[in-house]
């Protein structure tokens, strides 16, 4: 039986490196472990010098049986290391084929994209004169969301700088903690909302107040989660159906307020407020119960917590009863940096960081974060000036193209969407970091580095994924009911985005593709290849499965955001033709190569760790 070294007392001095080495040596060899009492009885009083003497005795083979066992262990280690090296060499050898293929693939995609954009630009909607100077290079601003964000960027940047400076001054000179900062953010965010929504702020405050009363009255009841969901889904649907309501429905003497509805539709932003209201309700409900997280066990496993910093998981599990006030609640719902587009942060995590500002990012880190955003923005500008992917999708001109060009446009649209959301979400997260509140990072991984649906959704709207896991997936039964939960979760995600049939179709298509992946992944996790050939075949099958998954993911997203359900049959018929089948095969081969490259990236990360 192995001794528990964590309970061994090495005198009153701090353990030296030599002492640690002795313990590791004893742990590695059972013959030493069986003689542990004799070794520990050495008259050393726990000093490093005496431990050095014991280690010398051990390494000089004065303990019987040590040399034989050491030789056997060394042989086993050498054999394992040799196999690992051979495996790494064979996998690295793949790069000789994979990297040139990827380079040729992207050169071809870029050249063909330039060609079709140049040939059809006169038929496309949403192109505007750009800043490259040549009339040949127009800017694709056909996406309304990107166009609005881009045009409002100067005024947003002024507001960002002003709010960040005021927050810093207020906290520094008034030494404000959670209560003071909540008052500050409530006041300044309310002014921000008056500019955005005008008189419609009345609707926001009314619904938020009703939700607060519901939480405070029923949070101790077992049926509270059901009430919370019914209330919030009811208003989510009503806001969309009635398009934010008209003041005239309350009487003609209120109709004049419809002339003061602000510059931004309030019911669009309110989708994020719905998520925050549910978060507040659940966090308060759980605060009245016992803690659900073993903090000591978490700290032992979490690398962020081990480094002396506080991770997001700990922040969102901090239940401080004094934080659940109406002022803190409203400041959380209306917090200006994250109000328009997120990222989504839980109530507990927000309240904790008003008390003590985030320490994960230093001033230098935040500055570098902002600089990287500027580089990414310039990349987006270059992309929209050269490639008109979204304009093809909006104009419907893609239906006139060949199957190869349809694939290129579809692939380009997904990359455009990824970069668009990447820039929007990181801009507002940068603003929040400047103000001392860290929200989860959306888009932590590139779109082209996700070879399965689970990885894709964890790394797309990542903060929303964390929210769904915490407030839907786990309460609905977690992994035990995973095959059923996915339908409820993705249907909610579709309805939350908008009341459109094509989004419902996207959600259900995603579920249909998700379920086989979950079944296969569950079987793959329990499979252990015993031979080199077995590992090779398993890796090849995984790469092929990744290629199919990426293809399904493209189809689901094109249905949801571009062609709609009615375009599925047309798309399938296009690729079943004599011209389309070679494109389909080439697409699968390209995605297979891409998946193998993703495996190489993951292997490199594991080696670094």
What are these model-derived regions, one by one?
Residues 2-31, 35-609:
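Non-catalytic, membrane-anchoring transmembrane segments at the edges
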